[in-house]
Every structure is written in structure tokens, then in C-alpha cells.
UniProtKB/Swiss-Prot annotation:
Keyword terms: Isomerase, Magnesium, Metal-binding, Phosphoprotein
Species per Swiss-Prot/TrEMBL record: Paracidovorax citrulli (strain AAC00-1)
Gene Ontology process terms (BP): carbohydrate metabolic process; peptidoglycan biosynthetic process; UDP-N-acetylglucosamine biosynthetic process
Residues found modified as Phosphoserine: S102
This protein's encoding gene: glmM
Cofactor: how and how many bound: Binds 1 Mg(2+) ion per subunit.
Any one GO cellular component localisation term in the record: cytosol
Name recorded for this polypeptide: Phosphoglucosamine mutase
């Protein structure tokens, strides 16, 4: 059964437009509360958020909806998505809720959920919530209404958890790091994590005003980080997105490294320490160069659909530990139950410190193939698969590339966009074919 409200990462949209309105979000929380009470008499949920101005409004709506269903609420304030996942598990809560639209600009917002174990919830749970949404509310009686409170030092608890994943035998002393938190949920957390492990930290993107989240900073706009690393002669740059679940890094020369390269580094580091790495899960977007480098190390790469939930599902199915996306969602399931930009950065830095080599030296033998991505806006109800102009162009390009490249055309799971990607050894050729396909998509 198709989901009506839930996308690949919760429910997301423009604030003030369905479904991201206070009345719907209240109803959503009430429906979730009713689902929780089917198996638990007095559930408790944690609610965290990023720094969007709309977070205040949506937080209040969620609190009211849960309380009206007889569910207690613990407010965490601004906290990275993986921090909410961690505290949900650590506090033995029934559910974790995050108010965030991740890397999107401030006019958007969203709601996503974590299980009591700090993991993404299955489709069946989301369908149960949608069914409850279609039913009439069943308000709890006055004696059964839920309560709300704030958790003291939620940020400090999460900081200590992040630090616990970094080897106690190692330090970041003598290392200068520029940290860009995208004016998002990690603004008051990320600089402290690296500082408390010994690094000299220069913070940018750490002054949220409710409107500037992800604006020209962070993992989706790394130019600011590159400039800051070069200007301050830093050793590393770390860029997170608005909810701090994705990571991009920069070396001392100002070169940017994406999730594909960092995923390979994490696998190679484990191999160098004699750990068993039977395989790694990437996505349809994972660069061919990484696949070949892993293969040379005797490690299989399996491609899942784009979206960290699909990477997680494949990891669980195979009982593997490492996976990730080009965008910087990296998963190390023996470190955390979900993607965590801060913990991923610590694992990369730990590998470099332990090996006594810079990021550039560590990854010098991995050179990504040129990959050109063009986004085409989709109109409401537009079926790109029925576009015969695009389908004919797709067949033609695939025939021309043969075994020397890849083409991927897919609809975004979070935005009304068609993503056209072409990967081949020649950048000009990749760009030509990608724009040719994008033009065909628009023409149809």
C-alpha cells in the first residue's frame, strides 16, 4: 500500500502548506500517540529540533497532540537528528521525534521518527499511523492526559556519547580544524566535541537566527569551509548539514571529500587493523572508482536505492556494519544506529591520526570518476517514466556509453525533482550527456 504522507525520510514540506501546518502536525502526533498506546499504557516520546524558526510552532503542536493522546513528552531543544536517536535509546523512551528538513532551506520543515532502539521505523508502522490519521480523534480523559518536561543538558549528554566513539588512546592535540555546522542543530555541539578531544577549533556556520540554516554554509554549500580552511591554514575542515546527519570534509589544501571517499576510508581503516569487512553498502549514486578500490581490497560493494533508510535496510539484511551515500550520510552500525555526521568525522580523523597520514595521503590512490548531476523540476502529477522523449534519449546515451560509464535517472524522495546523473571517465562527455537527458526530460 502506498503511503499518503510519509516520504523516504518522514514527512516534509513547506511550512504553512499541507502537510506542514500546525493543525496537521497536532493530528499527526495524536495519531502516533494512539498507535503507541496500543502496546504501551503510558508512552514517553522525546522531541528534538533543528534551528528553523518554524520549529517552535511545530514543537508546540507535537506536544499538544501527544499530550492529548495520553503520551508524555520530553523536550530536548535544538539537537542533531542522531542525537535524538541516541537519547531515545539511552532514556528508554518509546519514540524519538525530530523536527527538521535536514539540508533544505528554512521555509521547509519536516517530522521524522525513531524507534525505542534509535532506528528508523518500518513502512508498516508508518501505514498504521496514516490509518489512525484518517480516524476521528480519541482524546484522552483529563486524568489520563500526558505531561511535558525538558531534559537537562541534552546537548552535553550527546557530546559525551560522540566523544566515546573516539579512541581514548588518541588525541586531536596539535590539529587545527574548521567546523561548519550550517547554522543548524549542531551549532552548540560540534565545536565542543572537537575542542574537548584536543583540537584547535575555528567555528563557522554556528550562529543560527532561525532563517539562515543551510544558507551558503554547511555540507550542501562547502565553498565557505574550503575558503576558511585555506585562509586559516587548518589541517581539516568538517561540514555538517542542518540536522548534522551528513558530512563533507576538506583537507589542508582545500580539497573537498564526499561521502563516497570517506566511506572507502572507513572501510580501509578497518581492514588495516585486521577487522573483517565482508562488504559495504552504497547506493545507485556511489562512484565507480570507490567500487573498484573496494574490490581491489577484497570488499564487495552492494548498491541500494538512494536514501539512508534503504542503505540501513540492506545493511540489516546482510548483517554488515558500513554503508553510506555520496551526499555524506555514513553508517557505522557498531558506533551508532543511524547516520551521524559528527561521529563519522571522528572516525575519519581517528583513522588519519592512527595512521600518521593526512586525509590527502590516506586517500591519494582513490580518484573519483567525473559525475555530473542535473536536477529537473517535476510538475505535480508528472510521470517522468511515461516521457517518451526522455526514454528514447536514455536508450541512446546508454548505448553510446556502453561499459565506459553509467546513467541514473530517478525522482527525488524529498523534493519535486528528477535527478539525472551521468558518470564516465571524461567530464565533458558526462556533462554533455547529462544535459542532453535533462533537456529531453523538460521537453517531454
Amino acid at each position: 500500500m502506498a503511503r499518503k504522507y510519509f516520504g523516504t525520510d518522514g514527512i516534509r514540506g513547506t511550512v504553512g502548506q499541507a502537510p506542514i501546518t500546525p493543525d496537521f502536525v497536532l493530528r499527526l502526533a495524536h495519531a502516533v500517540g494512539r498507535v503507541l498506546r496500543r502496546t504501551e499504557e503510558r508512552p514517553t516520546v522525546l522531541i528534538g529540533k533543528d534551528t528553523r524558526i518554524s520549529g517552535y510552532m511545530l514543537e508546540s503542536a507535537l506536544e499538544s497532540g501527544f499530550n492529548s493522546a495520553g503520551v508524555d513528552v520530553v523536550l530536548l531543544g535544538p539537537l542533531p537528528t542522531p542525537g535524538v536517536a541516541y537519547l531515545t535509546r539511552a532514556q528508554r523512551a518509546s519514540l524519538g521525534v525530530v523536527i527538521s528538513a535536514s539540508h533544505n532551506a528554512y521555509p521547509d520543515n519536516g517530522i521524522k521518527f525513531f524507534s525505542a532502539q534509535g532506528t528508523k521505523l518500518p513502512d508498516e508502522w508508518e501505514l498504521a499511523v496514516e490509518a489512525a490519521l484518517d480516524e476521528a480523534p480519541a482524546w484522552a480523559d483529563s486524568a489520563s492526559l500526558g505531561k511535558a518536561r525538558r531534559l537537562e543538558d541534552a546537548a552535553g549528554r550527546y557530546i559525551e556519547f560522540c566523544k566515546s566513539t573516539f579512541s581514548q588512546d588518541l588525541t586531536l592535540k596539535g590539529t587545527k580544524i574548521v567546523v561548519d555546522a550550517a547554522h543548524g542543530a549542531a551549532y552548540h555541539i560540534a565545536p565542543k566535541v572537537f575542542h574537548e578531544l584536543g583540537a584547535e577549533v575555528l567555528a563557522i556556520g554556528c550562529s543560527p537566527d532561525g532563517l539562515n540554516i543551510n544558507h551558503q554554509v554547511g555540507a550542501t554549500h562547502p565553498d565557505a569551509l574550503v575558503r576558511a580552511v585555506r585562509a586559516n591554514r587548518a589541517d581539516y575542515g568538517v561540514a555538517l548539514d542542518g540536522d548534522a546527519d551528513r558530512l563533507q570534509m576538506v583537507d589542508a589544501a582545500g580539497r573537498l571529500y564526499n561521502g563516497d571517499e570517506l566511506l572507502y576510508l572507513l572501510a580501509a581503516d578497518r581492514l588495516s587493523r585486521g577487522e573483517n569487512v565482508p562488504g559495504v553498502v552504497g547506493t545507485l549514486m556511489t562512484n565507480m572508482a570507490v567500487e573498484l578500490a573496494l574490490k581491489a581490497d577484497g570488499v564487495e560493494l552492494v548498491r541500494a536505492k538512494v536514501g539512508d533508510r534503504y542503505v540501513l535496510e540492506e545493511l540489516a539484511r546482510r548483517r554488515w556494519l558500513l554503508g553510506g551515500e555520496s551526499s555524506g550520510h555514513l553508517l557505522a552500525l557498531d558506533r551508532h544506529t543511524t547516520g551521524d555526521g559528527l561521529i563519522s568525522a571522528l572516525q575519519v580523523l581517528q583513522a588519519c591520526v592512527r595512521g600518521g597520514r593526512s586525509l590527502a595521503r590516506t586517500l591519494e590512490h582513490v580518484r573519483l570518476f567525473p559525475q555530473v548531476l542535473v536536477n529537473v523540476r517535476l510538475l505535480p502529477g508528472q510521470d517522468w517514466k511515461a516521457n517518451t522523449v526522455l526514454q528514447d534519449a536514455l536508450k541512446s546515451v546508454e548505448a553510446e556509453l556502453g561499459t565506459q560509464g553509467r546513467v541514473l535517472v530517478r525522482a527525488s524522495g524529498t523534493e519535486p525533482l528528477l535527478r539525472v546523473m551521468v558518470e564516465t571517465s571524461d567530464a565533458d562527455r558526462a556533462s554533455h550527456f547529462a544535459h542532453q537527458l535533462a533537456d529531453a526530460a523538460r521537453a517531454g
